[in-house]
């Protein structure tokens, strides 16, 4: 498929199930890390990946991800799921996945704010930056995933930055759960 549009290189991020993330490129892709977690407390349910592409003397770090989609936490027995939902277990689990992914990728660089990094995928989470459209309480756990990214990484939400007064759904409904982040040097090149 990638060859149809001139891409002869393919990369598949880490995945534990049938939901992998795939990127294609005209340039060789180096696998930096396939991320699935390292135990019950840090399982990345649908996986993530860190790939690197070098071109024209530049180095582009690409992080792909797909976090847990349910309202209850991952690994919860069926009979305990309603309790987990009531405690916002899914939001808290996704936040753990985001922290783990960031620590395994962009946090590995001591100079990420000056490098080309992008992170994209199905976050299955809403962002506080869209709350003017949601009008949710400021203390909702629904924002935990993106709060972590905004507070602990140099990533910029590309869509929100480019179109600050607009809202773009990614679900066909009234939510945005798919995001594209990048660092400032890459953002300036867009």
Task: Give the positions of each predicted feature.
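Extracytoplasmic/periplasmic, Sec-exported soluble proteins
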Residues: 12-16, 41-43, 86-93, 172
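Active-site metal-binding loops of divalent metal-dependent hydrolases
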Residues: 67, 122-123
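Glycine-rich, phosphate-binding/catalytic loops in enzymes
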Residues: 2-5, 41, 79-80, 134-139
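A long, amphipathic alpha-helix that forms part
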Residues: 87-113
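Sec-exported extracytoplasmic/periplasmic mature domains
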Residues: 2-6, 29, 103-110, 128
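Structured beta-strand-rich core segments of catalytic domains in phosphoester-bond hydrolases
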Residues: 1-72
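A solvent-exposed, charged loop/short amphipathic helix patch at secondary-structure junctions
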Residues: 72-92
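Metal-dependent phosphoester-hydrolase catalytic domains
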Residues: 54, 107-118, 124-190
């Amino acid at each position: 498929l990638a060859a149809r549009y001139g891409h002869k290189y393919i990369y598949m991020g880490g995945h534990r199930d049938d939901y992998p993330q795939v990127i294609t490129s005209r340039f060789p892709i180096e696998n930096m890390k396939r991320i699935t977690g390292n135990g019950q407390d840090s399982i990345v349910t649908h996986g993530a990946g860190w790939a690197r592409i070098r071109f024209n003397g530049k180095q582009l770090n690409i992080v792909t991800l797909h976090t847990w989609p349910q309202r209850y936490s991952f690994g919860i027995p069926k009979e305990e799921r309603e309790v987990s939902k009531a405690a916002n277990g899914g939001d808290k689990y996704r936040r753990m996945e985001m922290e783990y992914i960031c620590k395994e990728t962009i946090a590995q660089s001591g100079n990420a704010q000056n490098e080309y990094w992008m992170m994209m995928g199905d976050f299955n989470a809403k962002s506080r930056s869209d709350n003017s459209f949601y009008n949710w309480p400021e203390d909702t756990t629904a924002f935990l995933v993106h709060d972590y990214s905004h507070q602990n990484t140099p990533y910029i939400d590309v869509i929100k930055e480019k179109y600050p007064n607009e809202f773009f759904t990614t679900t066909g409904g009234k939510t945005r759960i798919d995001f594209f982040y990048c660092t400032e040097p890459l953002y300036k090149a867009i």
